[in-house]
Amino acid sequence: MEKSRLGRLLVLLTSLVLLLAACSGGDDSSGAASEAAAGSEPAAEAESEVERGEVVIGSTNFTEQELVAEMYALVLEDAGYTVERSYQLGSREVVFPALQSGQIDVTPEYLGTLLEFLNGGAGEATADTDETLGLLTEQLPDGVTMLEPSEAQDKNALALTQEKATELGATTVSDLQGQSDLVLGGPPECPQRPLCLPGYEDTYGLEFASFQALDAGGPLTTEALNNGDIDVGLVFSTQGAIAANEWVVLEDDEGLQPAENITPAVREDILNGEVEELLDGVSSALTTENVIALNERIDVDGEDPADVAADFLAQEGILGEGSGAAPASEPMTDTSSEAAS
């Protein structure tokens, strides 16, 4: 009887020990699994996060450049990047080497003009955007690439007052054929530039009565056109004066002027999938018409480019209404375009 009770007690103790060991082992396994899961979460998050460092945005020295550069800066800042603004650096001869050397990371460019800058003025740029972009890509130095071109193009154009355009029935450059009594006004170098007077003569067969040396779509051209001192003025196709004066810009129906789509030129070492998506988003919102209106707000109405850029991006739904604009690093000193110069 005593042995029987002792045997049952030993069995009970053995079962209890085994049960405790099983529970303890289960707890360790659960703890290890929890630790493993906890440890894997930061790694997964790290893989999904994009590294957002500093990006330097540069521009040449006219307002449209600063306007678009500021749009690039704002969308990158909104996504969490640290942005340094280096605006109004000078001409393309200064800005593009800065991009190539890594002093800046992004700058707005113009397809045809950049192609001719890089190929030494070989005359390869055409009116076709894709063709010109393809040729430009072949000329780009290592480490620099072009993102998606915008629809907006800033290039040489011929403008008339509403009254003169109606009188001539002109909507295209070809409509000026046979009008040999017209006076053309433009920059002093126009008679020597292949995309200016010689180009209109050779491509369209135009014959002007005379040429007045003024400026490149600036105040002298504006005054002369509005006063009737000239009949046709050489302008840039996105300048604000077009909207302010309600000029008629003639369609370049024979494609004399090369494609000059506003396009981000970017150093490849900052691209991470997100940067190009953000900058391409800006490009997709830009058209020649809305850039004219934005330039008018700056050049004619006197608004600050940073404010205009932020307002536009908010209206397009690219930035939230509360996103602010940081001040530019340099004051504006030149409001004339160089895209087609």
What are these regions (language model features)?
Residues L19-A22:
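C-terminal motif of bacterial Sec signal peptides marking the signal peptidase cleavage site
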Residues G39, E45-E70, Y87-S91, E189-P191:
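Extracytoplasmic "Venus flytrap"
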Residues V183-D252:
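Ligand-binding pocket segment of bilobal, Venus flytrap-like solute-binding proteins
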Residues N156-T166, E260-G273:
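A bilobed periplasmic-binding-protein/Venus flytrap-type ligand-binding module shared by bacterial periplasmic
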Residues L118-L147, N227-D229, A241-E254:
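Ligand-binding "clamshell"
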Residues S24-D27:
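Bacterial signal peptide processing site
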